[in-house]
Amino acid sequence: MIKTLTAAITLLAAGGVVAVPHPVANEKPTRTQPLSKRATTVCGQWDSVQTGGYTVYNNLWGKDSGTGSQCLTVDGVSSGLLSWSTTWSWSGGQYNVKSYPNAVVSAPAARLSAISSIPTRWQWSYTGNSMVANVAYDLFTNSNCGTTPEYEIMVWIGAYGGAGPISQSGQPIASPNIGGVTWRLYKGSHSQMTVFSFVSPGQITNYSGDLVNFVRYLTQSQGMPASQCLYSAGAGTEPFTGSNARFTTSGYSMSISTSGSGGGEGGGGPNPPSCAALYGQCGGSGWSGPTCCTQGTCKAANQWYSQCS
């Protein structure tokens, strides 16, 4: 049930490095800990911190393609805004993403047709030497509200050092104006996923908008099925290479509102069991089922999937 995606990096026609989606399953468990009153710092490959309706992941999924280190500090939520930061230095594997430290909002899976708004605010800054990295929202969908992605929607609001999105041709397929910004839209594929990437013309270090407008553009203009189910929505940075880098989110928020229909697997069925059976799913981003186990303990494999074992 648990699989590991293998990154495949190609060059853009313009010569920039290309970001690939981080894997949605890994073989090693994640250590998740609730945030205490003080800031919490973690440095393990799959470490994460929960606070105020968000889970922030260190997520060093591509670390073996280079050499370096990364740590994550979560300050917590104040006045409705999450603050966190990551420090990293990576060398080698210049065309490979090393990690995706990111914050994922806790929300049940929902059909795209049922989502009425995804309001978000993100204020951030980046410093470092010879950085190649992006700053991006990352949304995953599939047809059955499970945890195997079929579509990935990225919204890039920052890029450094020639980082570029997955693309079949290296050229944008459209230039939609969304929220007063003209974005370059790229389309590509990775493993079983179709990847859409909206890339801003420059760094937007204080972004405020509604991500549902990107979703609607894809369903209305690019053939993405509105029946797809959004099960994970995060925001973070993908580093390739650089040294002494610090990415700081000084204020972040996201919420997902639905019209009350079209979410999950539909109504009329039995209520989910109070606890999952042995080897059953017991958690993960967007998971709305049982979170305890009738046998064994609930162990996180990654930010999308936890299993009773």
Curated annotation (Swiss-Prot):
<dbReference type="Pfam" id="PF01670">
    <property type="entry name" value="Glyco_hydro_12"/>
</dbReference>
<keyword id="KW-0624">Polysaccharide degradation</keyword>
<protein>
    <recommendedName>
        <fullName>Endoglucanase cel12C</fullName>
        <ecNumber>3.2.1.4</ecNumber>
    </recommendedName>
</protein>
<keyword id="KW-0136">Cellulose degradation</keyword>
<dbReference type="InterPro" id="IPR035971">
    <property type="entry name" value="CBD_sf"/>
</dbReference>
<feature type="domain" description="CBM1">
    <location>
        <begin position="274"/>
        <end position="309"/>
    </location>
</feature>
<comment type="function">
    <text>Endoglucanase that hydrolyzes 1,3-1,4-beta-glucan.</text>
</comment>
<dbReference type="Pfam" id="PF00734">
    <property type="entry name" value="CBM_1"/>
</dbReference>
<dbReference type="GO" id="GO:0005576">
    <property type="term" value="C:extracellular region"/>
</dbReference>
<keyword id="KW-0119">Carbohydrate metabolism</keyword>
<keyword id="KW-0325">Glycoprotein</keyword>
<feature type="signal peptide">
    <location>
        <begin position="1"/>
        <end position="19"/>
    </location>
</feature>
<dbReference type="GO" id="GO:0008810">
    <property type="term" value="F:cellulase activity"/>
</dbReference>
<dbReference type="InterPro" id="IPR013319">
    <property type="entry name" value="GH11/12"/>
</dbReference>
<feature type="glycosylation site" description="N-linked (GlcNAc...) asparagine">
    <location>
        <position position="206"/>
    </location>
</feature>
<dbReference type="InterPro" id="IPR002594">
    <property type="entry name" value="GH12"/>
</dbReference>
<keyword id="KW-0732">Signal</keyword>
<dbReference type="GO" id="GO:0030248">
    <property type="term" value="F:cellulose binding"/>
</dbReference>
<keyword id="KW-0964">Secreted</keyword>
<keyword id="KW-0326">Glycosidase</keyword>
<dbReference type="GO" id="GO:0030245">
    <property type="term" value="P:cellulose catabolic process"/>
</dbReference>
<dbReference type="InterPro" id="IPR000254">
    <property type="entry name" value="Cellulose-bd_dom_fun"/>
</dbReference>
<keyword id="KW-0378">Hydrolase</keyword>
<comment type="similarity">
    <text>Belongs to the glycosyl hydrolase 12 (cellulase H) family.</text>
</comment>
<dbReference type="InterPro" id="IPR013320">
    <property type="entry name" value="ConA-like_dom_sf"/>
</dbReference>
